[in-house]
């Protein structure tokens, strides 16, 4: 468009200049022989020409301004660094080079102290499948706001068995946190039964989203150690690729997710094969929407293992334990609610030093095979739970299993002076009743016997009257108050 304007303006310019020259020449040539009237007319034409000459630049379009160069998005495509998307050749060096250039790219300030904001740089695996022979790591600590996504990583046959394909770690760093806001998304990581998939060490606000992690060795699929706020969501993890009922289930090993830090979350995630689904040894973690059918309890598997005796402070909500259960050591401040336990899956409270306080196991569903498996069990082989407080096991829906609770209600009919209600089949803890309420209803009109609570030992409540009476005793007991 600018070129066409220039082409149109140029003839106009030449015509005007020609007219102006002819008018001026004519005026100078004949001014001596002109009449006063003609001379005045010529002077007016000369004035008009000068005005046109003054405004002439406005009639001619200036040449177009060359477009300014716009920086392209900082997407580091690994194929351009020599990575082989077919998975036939080792792509480790090429991907490490892309990670190095992303790390050294322009920054947009800092996040936490010592961590450069890389402005949302992306390392794009371009939908390829890449053979990896050693861990993928950044050159050093100090990177943040970066995404790695969109492809498959497969461990080579000589990948170190004690390492992880992606490692966010730097043993030499003195920073409080070494990485921040690193996102791993849309990845399939095949560990080839060598090492693990992802290690997040002392990092802050890390996201692992929509990842499929499989064939990890007798180690961890994902390891989170120290740091804060690693969020694992919408992901699938399994040592062996199966959909349940696998003939080799007895031999499943390894741990799918190992949380050795605080303030992390695992949400909407499936764990389909491993000896332990989720191991937790840090406080203030949240597990929500987690489906574990990693290895049946009868084969030695555990869905979720809480190994932090004395200060648990974790929540398991709205999850699904499928033929595998939960183990908690000396739990203090633990919530398990809204969770479905299928196939005789149960909760085991394991005594290490005898502490259990602030535990809430409520509003869950348990479904079993009718073989007499208790929904909540105690392991007191090390020592008995002798420090019990604020424990509530109640309002659980039970089908085909034995209900256990810290709150129980019972009644007994009789004709005499003593009524005994045995709560051992229901109460969770042996020989522990902290609170009792009872009501005696006499069947005979006009009878007002004296009555009293005489004994609550061995989880049995005994009520006696001063005279024989026909009636019913209703009792409510609580172990957790």
Curated annotation (Swiss-Prot):
Swiss-Prot/TrEMBL catalytic activity: (1,4-alpha-D-galacturonosyl)n+m + H2O = (1,4-alpha-D-galacturonosyl)n + (1,4-alpha-D-galacturonosyl)m
Top EC class for this record: hydrolase
Sequence ranges of the PbH1 repeats: 203-226, 261-282, 356-377
Entry's Gene Ontology cellular component terms: extracellular region
EC assignment: 3.2.1.15
Knockout or disruption consequences: The mature pollen grains are arranged in a tetrad. A layer of material is frequently deposited on the surface of the distal region of the pollen grains.
UniProt tissue specificity: Expressed in the tapetum cells in the anthers and in the ovules of open flowers.
Protein keywords: Cell wall, Cell wall biogenesis/degradation, Glycoprotein, Glycosidase, Hydrolase, Repeat, Secreted, Signal
Main subcellular location of this protein, as a coarse class: secreted
Compartments it resides in: Secreted, Cell wall
GO molecular function: polygalacturonase activity
Glycosylation: residue positions: 415, 455
Gene3D superfamilies to which the protein is assigned, alphabetical: Single-stranded right-handed beta-helix, Pectin lyase-like
GO biological process, one term: pollen exine formation
InterPro entries for this protein: Pectin_lyas_fold, Pectin_lyase_fold/virulence, QRT3-like
Leader peptide range in chain numbering: 1-27
Family membership: Belongs to the glycosyl hydrolase 28 family.
Database matches in PANTHER family: POLYGALACTURONASE QRT3
Function: Polygalacturonase required for degrading the pollen mother cell wall during microspore development.
Protein name: Polygalacturonase QRT3
Organism: Arabidopsis thaliana
């Amino acid at each position: 468009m600018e070129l066409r304007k220039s082409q149109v303006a140029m003839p106009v310019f030449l015509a005007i200049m020609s007219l102006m020259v002819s008018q001026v020449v004519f005026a100078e040539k004949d001014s001596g022989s002109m009449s006063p009237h003609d001379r005045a007319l010529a002077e007016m034409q000369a004035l008009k020409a000068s005005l046109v000459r003054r405004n002439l630049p406005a009639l001619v379009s200036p040449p177009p301004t060359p477009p300014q160069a716009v920086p392209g998005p900082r997407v580091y495509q690994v194929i351009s660094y020599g990575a082989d998307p077919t998975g036939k050749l080792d792509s480790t060096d090429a991907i490490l080079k892309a990670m190095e250039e992303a790390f050294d790219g322009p920054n947009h300030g800092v996040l936490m102290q010592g961590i450069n904001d890389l402005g949302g740089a992306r390392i794009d695996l371009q939908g390829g499948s890449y053979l990896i022979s050693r861990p993928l790591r950044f050159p050093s600590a100090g990177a943040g706001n970066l995404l790695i996504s969109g492809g498959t990583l497969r461990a080579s046959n000589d990948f170190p068995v004690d390492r992880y394909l992606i490692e966010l770690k730097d043993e030499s760093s003195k920073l409080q946190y070494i990485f921040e806001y690193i996102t791993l998304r849309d990845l399939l990581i095949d560990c080839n039964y060598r090492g693990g998939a992802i290690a997040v060490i002392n990092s802050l606000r890390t996201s692992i989203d929509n990842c499929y992690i499989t064939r990890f060795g007798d180690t961890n699929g994902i390891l989170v150690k120290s740091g804060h706020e690693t969020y694992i969501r919408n992901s699938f993890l399994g040592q062996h690729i199966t959909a349940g009922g696998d003939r080799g289930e007895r031999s499943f090993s390894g741990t799918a997710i190992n949380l050795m830090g605080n303030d992390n979350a695992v949400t909407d995630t499936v764990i389909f094969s491993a000896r332990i689904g989720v191991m937790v040894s840090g406080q203030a973690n949240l597990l929500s929407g987690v489906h574990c059918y990693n290895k049946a309890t009868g084969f030695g598997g555990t869905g979720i293992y809480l190994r932090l005796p004395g200060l648990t402070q974790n929540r398991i909500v709205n999850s699904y334990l499928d033929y595998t259960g939960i183990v908690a050591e000396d739990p203090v401040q633990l919530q398990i609610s809204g969770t479905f336990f299928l196939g005789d899956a149960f909760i085991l409270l394991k005594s290490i030093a005898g502490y259990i306080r602030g535990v809430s196991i409520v509003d869950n569903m348990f479904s079993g095979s009718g073989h007499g498996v208790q929904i909540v069990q105690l392991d007191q082989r090390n020592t008995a739970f002798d420090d019990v407080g604020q424990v509530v096991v109640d309002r659980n829906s039970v089908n085909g299993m034995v209900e256990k609770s810290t709150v129980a209600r019972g009644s007994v009919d009789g004709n005499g002076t003593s009524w005994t209600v045995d709560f051992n089949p229901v109460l969770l803890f042996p020989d522990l009743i902290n609170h009792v309420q009872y009501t005696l209803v006499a069947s005979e009109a006009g009878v007002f016997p004296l009555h009293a609570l005489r004994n609550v030992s061995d989880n049995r409540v005994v009520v006696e009257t001063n005279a024989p009476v026909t009636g019913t005793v209703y009792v409510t007991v609580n172990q957790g108050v």
